[in-house]
Amino acid sequence: MSVYVITGASKGIGFGFVKSISEDPANLVVGLVRDKAATEKKVAEELGGRTNIHILHGDLTSYESLKQAAADTAKIVGERGVDYLVANGAYPSQFDAYVPIGALGDQVEELEEVSAKLFKTNVVGNIHLFNLFIPLVKQSKAKKVIAISSGHGDLDWINNNDIEISSLYGASKAALNVVVAKFSVQYKPEGVLFFSLSPGAVEVGHYDNVSPEQVQGLMGFMGKIQAYAPHFKGAVPVEDAVRTIRATWERASIETGYAGAFVSQHGNKQWL
């Protein structure tokens, strides 16, 4: 039996993790979400109210909510601790998702606001999360912390494939990767594995309501994707992504070189 804490558990990959992991009644899953009532309702309706799922309020932009979530989690898991802390929650900015960074220059206020929100949520929020939950992780058997990152934070991928879009979001994920590496350096001697993982392209509805102008931006990006990964057929269903990601984090270890690493869903640098 393993204990999992998953942030951003209300939808997308986060809810996919909750659904998949809780299928084994021996596992215990704690999901951190901003809207506790709505997520509890979703769990009851879609997962039959599985008793091995606990939903807690936890907002990456609120230190106090994360502190309370850690305290509540400690009461739930007891001496077992947290085997897997999955830092999945994030702010996926749309502001920079379709255009090059230079095209944002005239939108000064929004650029500053979005950048601040990205850093507070995707970077500082996870620093707080790790600091607050590390005592529980150290109590466990598995001792694994997985940060869900993005290929947009990989410098080689950006430079080698001329990836222009998602500049601010990518910068926040690159910063998260550095944070994870720093935590790894600190806690590796105590047997805690920290690493970052990009889930690849997953069908979670990010592009359901794009405008014609945004489609134009995506077309250029998709052309580069086809050149980078000719085998790529499009975003995969959440269920498939979760299966691949879980297989990677299960085999990941300090001994096999994952400590502080930034890898794809496959455990390498092939992002798609």
UniProtKB/Swiss-Prot annotation:
PROSITE patterns for the chain: ADH_SHORT (PS00061)
Single annotated GO MF: oxidoreductase activity, acting on the CH-OH group of donors, NAD or NADP as acceptor
A Pfam entry, by short name: adh_short
Effect of disrupting the coding gene: Abolishes the production of iso-A82775C, but accumulates pestalofone A.
Entry's EC annotation: 1.1.1.-
Source species, domain of life: Eukaryota
Residues of the active site: 150 (proton donor), 169 (proton donor), 173 (lowers pka of active site tyr)
Keywords, ordered alphabetically: NADP, Oxidoreductase
Record function comment: Short-chain dehydrogenase/reductase; part of the gene cluster that mediates the biosynthesis of iso-A82775C, a enylepoxycyclohexane and biosynthetic precursor of the chloropestolide anticancer natural products. Within the cluster, the prenyltransferase iacE prenylates siccayne to generate pestalodiol E, using dimethylallyl diphosphate (DMAPP) as cosubstrate. The probable oxidoreductase iacF is then involved in the epoxidation of pestalodiol F to pestalodiol F, which is further converted to pestalofone A by the short-chain dehydrogenase/reductase iacG.
Entry protein name: Short-chain dehydrogenase/reductase iacC
Native organism: Pestalotiopsis fici (strain W106-1 / CGMCC3.15140)
Biological classification of the source: Eukaryota, Fungi, Dikarya, Ascomycota, Pezizomycotina
